[in-house]
C-alpha cells in the first residue's frame, strides 16, 4: 500500500543536512547513507550517494527519473549466482 498523500514523502533528517552541505561545498563527493527507506527528492538531483546494501556502499548518481523512488531500489542487497549447470550435459 502506498504512503498517504497528506503525510508527504519520508526522508531522514540527517540526509537533508548532508545534501545541503554537499551543495554548499560544491565538491562532487559521495555522500554515504544507510537510509535505504528515504525517498529521493528533487533537491537531490545531480548528487552522488553511497547507498549501503549491507556489505558495501554502492554509488548512486541521482537523476530526474529517480525522484519519488526510494534509495534502496537502486542498491540491490542480494547477488544471484546463476542456476546450477546441468551435470549430465557436462559428463558426456
Curated annotation (Swiss-Prot):
Keywords: Ribonucleoprotein, Ribosomal protein, RNA-binding, rRNA-binding
A biological process term (GO) from this entry: translation
GO cellular component assignments: cytoplasm; small ribosomal subunit
The organism's place on the tree of life at top rank: Bacteria
One Pfam family in the UniProt entry: Ribosomal_S19
Coiled-coil ranges from the UniProt annotation: none
Matching InterPro entries: Ribosomal_uS19, Ribosomal_uS19_bac-type, Ribosomal_uS19_CS, Ribosomal_uS19_SF
Keyword rRNA-binding: yes
Any GO molecular function: rRNA binding
Recorded family membership: Belongs to the universal ribosomal protein uS19 family.
Matching PANTHER family: RIBOSOMAL PROTEIN S19P FAMILY MEMBER, SMALL RIBOSOMAL SUBUNIT PROTEIN US19M
UniProt function note: Protein S19 forms a complex with S13 that binds strongly to the 16S ribosomal RNA.
UniProt protein name: Small ribosomal subunit protein uS19
Amino acid at each position: 500500500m502506498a504512503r498517504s498523500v497528506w503525510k508527504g514523502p519520508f526522508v531522514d533528517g540527517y540526509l537533508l543536512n548532508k545534501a545541503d552541505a554537499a551543495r554548499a561545498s560544491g565538491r562532487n563527493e559521495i555522500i554515504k547513507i544507510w537510509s535505504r527507506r528515504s525517498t529521493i527528492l528533487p533537491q537531490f538531483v545531480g548528487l552522488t550517494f553511497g547507498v549501503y546494501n549491507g556489505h558495501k556502499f554502492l554509488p548512486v548518481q541521482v537523476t530526474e527519473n529517480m525522484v519519488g523512488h526510494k534509495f534502496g531500489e537502486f542498491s540491490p542487497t542480494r547477488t544471484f549466482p546463476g542456476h546450477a549447470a546441468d551435470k549430465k550435459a557436462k559428463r558426456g
